[in-house]
Amino acid sequence: LANGTAWAGAGNGYQIASMVKSGQNGVNRTVYAYAMSNGVADRNNILKFNFTASGNNFTLDANSAVGIAVSATEMASAEKTAKRDLNGDQVFGVNINASAVDAQGGLYKGTMLGKEFYIAGSGLRTGSTGSLARDLTGALVNADGTAWAPATGYSVASLVAERANNVVTG
């Protein structure tokens, strides 16, 4: 901590699941600790704690002192970048359903932190190793970034997309 005392851990019903280091040779060295809830019903609640190099130690950043809630998108991206299973779910990134919603159109369903996403892509599979970790690139999301889902009473049968400059436009 900034006052020189040792960090006591995530506390409040959370346990550290993993740690990732960034930066090298004393330049911009940062440690990110990911903590998951101990509650059975809340295993998908993840907090991130940021530590910055301070001499030979790492000091907890004030803005993450109580932990920063991690979204499904952030967790998937962090796992892909780190090439590791950071939340202890035995999956590298997004867990892609074995059966495509529409393989020909390129629509799949995936899960991250208990949230279901529709994902546009080709031949998507769950990453079986860190180097194959998949993030939520191609996910269908609402304007606020939350997972898009069809209205109650409807289901998705296929994906039809127009591509302009390799961007889905419709």
Residue spans for each PLM region:
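Long, low-complexity, Gly/Thr
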Residues: 1-170
